């Protein structure tokens, strides 16, 4: 059984203008995907193709117009209050914009402790122990707990968001362009940390990105998305064999590791 799946998902947004006219835009067209326990799947596509919309549907932040999202085989719409609380614990989302994903006036301690307050019954002492454990896990010093988001670096803030996602021992983390704003060294560090956590805890990842280079480093299976549809599914080891035009464009957009000097011809 899949950990999480989307079955024939359609998402249509309807907008209304000031003069009363309305417009319908279909963002997702008949999407079906599944992710197994401990698996890393990449969702690859250009900006605006519907990747983030699908991510929000998978974590229950939005509902599909038609189709079902299922967690351990049960539709999210069938979960009762306790079932939805368990789902919130087991499926976490890390956003691209880490400064926008946290309260600028909250301490790091409060940010990491937020899911512990809402999704567990831990008392204050045990919450503090868990926060310190998480800081060690993401390799941050204990004193950072008293700082505000503006007092830490971008790489540190992304690790804080990872720690918050890990706080309630999730089975699946959806990373929505979560390392795209980091420089290449911080990206490598974040991916190494996520890989280590997966090896230790069996976490599954859905890695949402436009960067094929990162897919090659992190995922085992790749779903290519274009204009709200999954247009290709391929193993990461076979990425050079991608056939769809959208897939080839993404492959061609990957920069070489070093600038290529043009060869002069006479």
Curated annotation (Swiss-Prot):
SUPFAM superfamilies: P-loop containing nucleoside triphosphate hydrolases. One of its GO terms (molecular function) is ABC-type nickel transporter activity. It is found in: Cell inner membrane. Pfam families: ABC_tran (PF00005). Residues 4-252 form the ABC transporter domain. It catalyses: Ni(2+)(out) + ATP + H2O = Ni(2+)(in) + ADP + phosphate + H(+). It is a peripheral membrane protein. Keywords: ATP-binding, Cell inner membrane, Cell membrane, Ion transport, Membrane, Nickel, Nickel transport, Nucleotide-binding, Translocase, Transport. Coiled coil: none annotated. The keyword Disulfide bond does not apply. ATP binds at residues 45-52. Part of the ABC transporter complex NikABCDE involved in nickel import. Responsible for energy coupling to the transport system. PANTHER family: D,D-DIPEPTIDE TRANSPORT ATP-BINDING PROTEIN DDPF-RELATED (PTHR43776:SF7), TRANSPORT ATP-BINDING PROTEIN (PTHR43776). The complex is composed of two ATP-binding proteins (NikD and NikE), two transmembrane proteins (NikB and NikC) and a solute-binding protein (NikA). This is Nickel import ATP-binding protein NikE. It comes from Brucella abortus (strain 2308).
